[in-house]
């Protein structure tokens, strides 16, 4: 046994030594050429960037894929609400039905084509975990739908960046995560940027943007964060297929969305306030709008009015496109959390903020919700990118410290093993 343990320790030491020899060579090579060459610093930066990309190429490719899907998901979500924003509950429930059917079909195909060993996982019962995740997701979707009705595209992308400090706080409290000073600095820069943007916008007369609905959308980040943390805990303790997870969560979410209905009865939400007595009519009008293209609210509506004007013609095409990208988005989120962690997903998702803002500049992507570029947008993008880069630097430092600690621990174990072997 000691011989096998010693062999494993040797392999770990060799692997870690090779990686850190590569990093040390970058530093030593730079010291040789940096004194006499003005390009020494630039070469060192390029080599360090190349080393970072080479060691994490899979993560970056996955990030690009998730970025594209996530941006399209958010853009078509806004386009859907711009057409049928008066019927948020209807669109949410129909979307849940589509997700349930698609995920159940995918999981059925997976079980038929997979080996018998992987099917044993389906015998385990994760009912309460599925219910908790679905309840949190339902709360997130409903609250986000409400917030989006009076949140402009650019502000939407800005608010999504708040997920970084929100996830940091809850992961610190409940999952025991610890962070580097640069992580806190990066999150602080993002927070300051968001605060500055909201302050400027509060003095502007934007009838299609409401501070109250911005705050509602920010509040949706809390159940989203808890949902991601629950997924991480479940993935770490049990081996759950991500397709099955999404299928069961979508099924539960169809029913748990009913628990969030009282939100529509809050009187101060003037734009979407709907007493229980009018919900039946609203659901009927929403179904006719989505499936038959019949607009009901066409008078006394629009910018500055209590209700949005229905634009039901062709709304189902936009809605189906949104559902497709949302399904892909859910699968990628679960995969990233399963293979990495909640904070890895947070780092990847923070890139979508600037990307969404840019996407709203192009009419072929944003359609009727296209926005004109403003200086404030670019200043905000700079603040987000600066905060994101500093946050990533903190992660790199923490990863290096963790690997060095593991290397030292393996070295100590190897020495103890050799002593035990010699005394034996």
UniProtKB/Swiss-Prot annotation:
The keyword Disulfide bond applies. It is a multi-pass membrane protein. Glycans are attached at residue 86. Its main location: membrane. The keyword Transmembrane helix applies. GO terms for molecular function: xenobiotic transmembrane transporter activity. Residues 78-88, 147-156, 202-209, 270-317, 368-377 are vacuolar. Residues 1-56, 110-125, 178-180, 231-248, 339-346, 399-424 are cytoplasmic. Keywords: Amino-acid transport, Disulfide bond, Glycoprotein, Membrane, Transmembrane, Transmembrane helix, Transport, Vacuole. It is found in: Vacuole membrane. One of its GO terms (biological process) is amino acid transport. Belongs to the CRT-like transporter family. Nutrient transporter. Involved in maintaining the osmotic homeostasis of the digestive vacuole. This is Putative chloroquine resistance transporter.
């Amino acid at each position: 046994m000691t011989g096998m343990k010693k062999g494993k320790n040797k392999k770990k030491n060799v692997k870690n030594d090779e990686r850190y020899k590569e990093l040390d060579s970058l530093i030593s090579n730079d010291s040789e050429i940096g004194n006499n060459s003005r390009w020494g610093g630039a070469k060192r930066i390029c080599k360090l960037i190349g080393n970072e990309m080479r060691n994490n190429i899979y993560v970056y490719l996955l990030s690009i894929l998730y970025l594209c899907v996530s941006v399209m998901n958010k853009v078509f979500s806004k386009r859907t609400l711009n057409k049928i924003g008066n019927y948020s509950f209807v669109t949410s429930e129909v979307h849940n039905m589509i997700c349930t059917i698609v995920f159940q079909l995918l999981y059925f195909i997976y079980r038929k084509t997979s080996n018998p060993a992987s099917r044993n996982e389906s015998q385990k019962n994760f009912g309460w975990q599925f219910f908790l995740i679905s309840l949190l997701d339902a709360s997130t979707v409903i609250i986000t739908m409400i917030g989006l009705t009076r949140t402009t595209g650019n502000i939407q992308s800005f608010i999504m960046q708040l997920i970084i400090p929100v996830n940091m706080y809850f992961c610190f409290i409940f999952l025991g995560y610890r962070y580097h000073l640069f992580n806190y600095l990066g999150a602080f820069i993002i927070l300051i940027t968001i605060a500055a943007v909201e302050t400027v916008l509060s003095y502007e007369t934007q009838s299609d943007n409401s501070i109250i609905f911005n705050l509602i959308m920010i509040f949706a980040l809390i159940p989203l964060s808890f949902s991601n943390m629950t997924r991480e805990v479940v993935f770490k303790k049990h081996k759950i297929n991500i397709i099955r997870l999404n299928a069961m969560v979508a099924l539960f979410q169809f029913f748990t969305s009913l628990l969030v209905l009282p939100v529509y009865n809050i009187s101060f939400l003037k734009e979407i306030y709907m007493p229980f007595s009018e919900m039946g009519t609203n659901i009927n009008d929403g179904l006719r709008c989505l499936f038959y293209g019949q607009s009901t609210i066409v008078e006394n509506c629009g910018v500055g009015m209590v209700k949005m004007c229905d634009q039901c013609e062709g709304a189902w095409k936009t809605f189906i496109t949104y559902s497709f990208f949302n399904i892909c988005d859910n699968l990628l989120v679960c995969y990233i959390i399963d293979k990495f962690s909640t904070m890895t997903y947070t780092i990847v998702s923070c890139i979508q903020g600037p990307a969404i803002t840019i996407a709203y500049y192009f009419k072929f992507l944003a359609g009727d919700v296209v926005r004109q570029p403003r200086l404030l947008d670019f200043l905000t993008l700079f603040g987000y990118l600066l905060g994101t880069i500093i946050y990533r630097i903190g992660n790199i430092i923490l990863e290096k410290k963790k690997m060095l600690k593991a290397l030292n621990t393996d070295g100590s174990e190897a020495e103890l093993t050799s002593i035990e072997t010699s005394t034996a």
